[in-house]
Amino acid sequence: MASAARLTMMWEEVTCPICLDPFVEPVSIECGHSFCQECISQVGKGGGSVCPVCRQRFLLKNLRPNRQLANMVNNLKEISQEAREGTQGERCAVHGERLHLFCEKDGKALCWVCAQSRKHRDHAMVPLEEAAQEYQEKLQVALGELRRKQELAEKLEVEIAIKRADWKKTVETQKSRIHAEFVQQKNFLVEEEQRQLQELEKDEREQLRILGEKEAKLAQQSQALQELISELDRRCHSSALELLQEVIIVLERSESWNLKDLDITSPELRSVCHVPGLKKMLRTCAVHITLDPDTANPWLILSEDRRQVRLGDTQQSIPGNEERFDSYPMVLGAQHFHSGKHYWEVDVTGKEAWDLGVCRDSVRRKGHFLLSSKSGFWTIWLWNKQKYEAGTYPQTPLHLQVPPCQVGIFLDYEAGMVSFYNITDHGSLIYSFSECAFTGPLRPFFSPGFNDGGKNTAPLTLCPLNIGSQGSTDY
């Protein structure tokens, strides 16, 4: 122990007061204290130039190498060299002594010299074997927890793999169902198309047969009339005796002859274009439309939510801006459509007149003008409670078997198409504008019509729809 104590004292004598490790290139300053050259140089560079031990000032240029201390460090290292050889892993790399203590603060294995040094002497120490036992137990606990987490991770990996496989299977099954459903729907639509075409052809044949019969009867009457005309003409150019022969009977025949009423009014189609499931498909393109008060004619009254419009009894005192219609009871939707597919529905219940459709944002708003596709309006309308027309040039009469209470409007910008559907009649097609040359933004168009002495006071109301995933928000 005495030898160990002396070695400890010797190591302390060759320990730098700054880094607390054995001297490396030791130097002495004016006051006589020694330090590692690098350590004291860093102190001097910091502007202090004060001895860390006695606080006396010193100059870096006066540093003196301390060869005696350097030799002592080398001698101590040589003494420990033999002990280090062959047992390097269990020996202190600095002092060459056996590592048999554990510093709990620094978490390091120490030799007895390190433990007595100023760097560690105030730290709690335990025997290396005791520390190893304690940390062995802690490591076992940590290892058990990590293995439990590893098992959980492996279990999750298996579950993810199963879920991935199940999901792929589910998607493939759904793909097959979708494909089969659409194949079935396509086949059904083909069959329904053929059925409706056959009904239309049947209507065509029936009406042509009726018209043919009327034409034959008319031909018979025309022939009888021509024969009577010829007889009267012949009598007018014959002798007096021939003219007077049975003249009374002939005159009675001519006076009693009348063209029989054949009722040749235009036939109406009994079949309509009705595509099963069309409403559902159109509503996937549904958009939320609101009315733009800045475009509303001063006589129009908009609801608070801007989803309903009616003609008021008095003209409102509102600014006459450039966007506002001033001559007709018209209003535009607030939305601007530059592309995409868009669909909305309007309730026209109880109305005797209305106009619906789309128009260019740049259409004329002031004075009198014609609603037609030539002037940038793609609309249909009802007037006088029974006359439906499309705003072509000239107008196209529309024949509806079922008066609509709700009208669907579908805009396909890229296809240049605006279509109108009778929602009341299972979504049957009313009319389509096709191959339209759209330029610039389009806007929904509405007119509740004039009141017509109180007969057309019901409002136009935008119907609530579930906004579809394909409906564009490019407003």
From Swiss-Prot:
**Top-level class of the enzyme under EC nomenclature:** transferase
- Copy the pathway line from the protein's UniProt record: Protein modification; protein ubiquitination
Superkingdom classification of source? Eukaryota
> In Gene Ontology terms, what is a biological process of this protein?
pyroptotic inflammatory response
Instruction: Tell me what this protein is called.
Output: E3 ubiquitin-protein ligase TRIM21
Q: Which organism is it from?
A: Homo sapiens (Human)
Stretches annotated zinc finger (RING-type): 16-55
What is its biological role?
E3 ubiquitin-protein ligase whose activity is dependent on E2 enzymes, UBE2D1, UBE2D2, UBE2E1 and UBE2E2. Forms a ubiquitin ligase complex in cooperation with the E2 UBE2D2 that is used not only for the ubiquitination of USP4 and IKBKB but also for its self-ubiquitination. Component of cullin-RING-based SCF (SKP1-CUL1-F-box protein) E3 ubiquitin-protein ligase complexes such as SCF(SKP2)-like complexes. A TRIM21-containing SCF(SKP2)-like complex is shown to mediate ubiquitination of CDKN1B ('Thr-187' phosphorylated-form), thereby promoting its degradation by the proteasome.
Subunit = Homotrimer. Interacts (via C-terminus) with IRF8 (via C-terminus). Component of a SCF(SKP2)-like complex containing CUL1, SKP1, TRIM21 and SKP2. Interacts with CALR, CUL1, FBXW11, HSPA5, IKBKB, IRF3, SKP1 and VCP. Interacts with SKP2; the interaction with SKP2 does not depend on an intact F-box domain. Interacts (via N-terminus and C-terminus) with DCP2 (via N-terminus and C-terminus). Interacts with ULK1, BECN1 and with ATG8 family members, including GABARAP, GABARAPL1, GABARAPL2 and MAP1LC3C/LC3C. Interacts with TRIM21 and SQSTM1/sequestosome 1. Interacts with IRF3.
Q: Which residues bind Zn(2+)?
A: C92, H95, C114, H120
Q: Which GO terms describe its molecular function?
A: DNA binding; identical protein binding; RNA binding; transcription coactivator activity; ubiquitin protein ligase activity; ubiquitin-protein transferase activity; zinc ion binding
Task: Enumerate the subcellular locations listed in this protein's record, separating them with semicolons.
Answer: Cytoplasm; Cytoplasmic vesicle, Autophagosome; Nucleus; Cytoplasm, P-body
B box-type zinc finger span = 92-123
Q: Which InterPro entries match?
A: B30.2/SPRY, B30.2/SPRY_sf, Butyrophylin_SPRY, ConA-like_dom_sf, PRY, PRY/SPRY_TRIM21, SPRY_dom, TRIM/RBCC
Post-translational events: Autoubiquitinated; does not lead to its proteasomal degradation. Deubiquitinated by USP4; leading to its stabilization.
- Disulfide bridge positions per record: none
Going by the UniProt record, its keywords in alphabetical order are: Cell cycle, Coiled coil, Cytoplasm, Cytoplasmic vesicle, DNA-binding, Host-virus interaction, Metal-binding, Nucleus, Phosphoprotein, Ribonucleoprotein, RNA-binding, Transferase, Ubl conjugation, Ubl conjugation pathway, Zinc, Zinc-finger
User: Which of the residues bear the PTM Phosphoserine?
Assistant: S266
